[in-house]
C-alpha cells in the first residue's frame, strides 16, 4: 500500500491556497487540554472550532473553543458557534472562523464524517483547515499536531457525488490523495519563550532509563486488533462488490439469451407477415443495477495503510530498544 501511495502521489494536484499554518501556543494548549480531557472521559473524539485570520499565504490560528458534547438534540451547534464568536469579538479576540480541530488515536483520523465536515468547511471557507491532534502518541512524549486540507480531486469527487469505480478512476482519487498535509508551526511570544527557558532550568534532568522500557505489548496489541478489524471490514466490502459483479454478469447473460430468443421470435413473425416486436420490451426487463459506493472501502484501505505504517515504525523502535538493552545487559554481566 505504501508503494501504491508513492506511485500515485505525483498525479496529485497542488493546492496553493495556504502554504503553512501558524498556531499560537495558547491555542495549541487549549486543543491539547480539551482532547486529553475528552479522551479520559471515554468520548470517541473531541472537536472544536479554530479562530484566526489569513495573512497572504499563511493561516494564523490565534484561538479556539470546543464544540458542545451534549446529547440534547435541541442544542443548535451553529447557533452556539455564532454566539461564541460574537462574545469573543466583544473582548477583541480574533473571531474569524478558519477551520476546526479533532482528536485522533494513533494518527488514524480518516473517516467518512471527517471528509464530509471538511468538504463543507472548505467549500464555505476556502482557506479552512482541519487540525488533528494524536492523543496516544502525544501521551508517549511526541507532540503530534497536523493540519490537513482536502485535495482538489477530493472536492471534485464530492461535488459530483459519484463514488463509483469509474468516477474515482477518472478523477484519480485514492485514499493516499484525499488530504494534503499543510506544515504547521507553533509560535509563542518572547515572554513565553523566556519563561519556558527558565522553567527548563528548574526541571531536574532525567536519567533516561524510561526510554528503554520494553513494556510495549499493550500498544502493539491495540494496533494489531484495530488492523484486524479494518481488514475484516475491507474483506466484507470486497465480498459485497464481488457479489455485485457476479449479479451484473448473470444479468447480462440472461439479457443476451432473451435478446437471442426475441430475435428468433421476430424472425418467425416476419416470416408470417406479422410486425416485429421492438427490443425495448426486453430492455425494460433488465434495468441497470445500482453500483455500490466505493468511498467506504477507500477510507478503510487508508486506515489499514495508516495502521500498517504505525506498526512498522513501532516495531523498528522496539527492535532498537531490544538491541540496546541486550548490549547493556551484556556489558553489566562482563563487569560482574
Curated annotation (Swiss-Prot):
Location in the cell: Cytoplasm
GO cellular component: eukaryotic 43S preinitiation complex; eukaryotic 48S preinitiation complex; eukaryotic translation initiation factor 3 complex
Domain MPN: 21-154
A Pfam entry, by short name: eIF3h_C
UniProt keyword Transport, yes or no: no
Record's subunit section: Component of the eukaryotic translation initiation factor 3 (eIF-3) complex.
Protein name, UniProt field: Eukaryotic translation initiation factor 3 subunit H
Gene source species: Aedes aegypti (Yellowfever mosquito)
Amino acid at each position: 500500500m505504501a508503494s501504491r501511495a508513492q506511485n500515485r502521489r505525483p498525479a496529485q494536484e497542488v493546492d496553493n491556497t495556504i502554504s503553512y499554518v501558524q498556531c499560537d501556543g495558547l491555542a495549541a494548549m487549549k486543543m491539547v487540554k480539551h482532547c486529553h480531557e475528552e479522551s479520559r472521559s471515554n468520548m470517541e473524539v473531541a472537536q472544536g472550532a479554530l479562530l484566526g485570520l489569513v495573512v497572504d499565504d499563511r493561516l494564523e490560528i490565534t484561538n479556539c473553543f470546543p464544540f458542545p458534547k451534549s446529547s440534547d438534540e435541541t442544542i443548535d451547534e451553529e447557533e452556539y458557534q455564532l454566539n461564541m464568536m460574537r462574545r469573543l469579538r466583544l473582548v477583541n479576540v480574533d473571531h474569524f472562523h478558519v477551520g476546526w480541530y479533532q482528536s485522533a488515536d494513533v494518527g488514524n483520523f480518516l473517516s467518512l464524517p471527517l471528509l464530509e465536515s471538511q468538504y463543507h468547511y472548505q467549500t464555505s471557507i476556502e482557506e479552512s483547515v482541519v487540525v488533528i491532534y494524536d492523543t496516544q502518541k502525544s501521551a508517549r512524549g511526541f507532540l503530534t499536531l497536523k493540519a490537513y486540507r482536502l485535495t482538489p480531486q477530493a472536492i471534485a469527487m464530492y461535488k459530483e457525488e459519484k463514488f463509483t469505480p469509474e468516477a474515482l478512476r477518472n478523477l484519480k482519487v485514492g485514499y493516499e490523495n484525499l488530504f494534503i498535509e499543510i506544515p504547521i508551526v507553533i509560535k509563542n511570544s518572547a515572554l513565553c519563550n523566556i519563561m519556558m527557558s527558565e522553567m527548563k532550568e528548574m526541571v531536574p534532568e532525567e536519567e533516561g532509563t524510561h526510554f528503554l522500557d520494553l513494556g510495549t505489548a499493550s500498544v502493539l496489541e491495540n494496533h494489531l486488533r484495530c488492523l484486524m478489524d479494518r481488514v475484516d471490514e475491507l474483506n466484507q466490502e470486497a465480498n459485497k462488490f464481488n457479489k455485485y459483479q457476479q449479479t451484473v454478469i448473470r444479468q447480462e447473460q440472461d439479457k443476451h439469451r432473451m435478446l437471442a430468443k426475441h430475435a428468433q421470435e421476430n424472425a418467425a413473425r416476419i416470416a408470417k407477415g406479422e410486425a416485429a416486436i421492438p427490443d425495448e420490451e426486453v430492455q425494460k426487463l433488465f434495468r441497470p443495477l445500482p453500483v455500490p459506493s466505493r468511498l467506504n472501502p477507500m477510507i478503510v484501505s487508508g486506515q489499514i495503510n495508516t495502521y500498517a505504517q504505525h506498526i512498522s515504525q513501532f516495531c523498528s523502535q522496539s527492535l532498537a530498544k531490544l538491541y540496546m538493552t541486550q548490549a547493556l545487559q551484556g556489558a553489566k554481566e562482563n563487569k560482574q
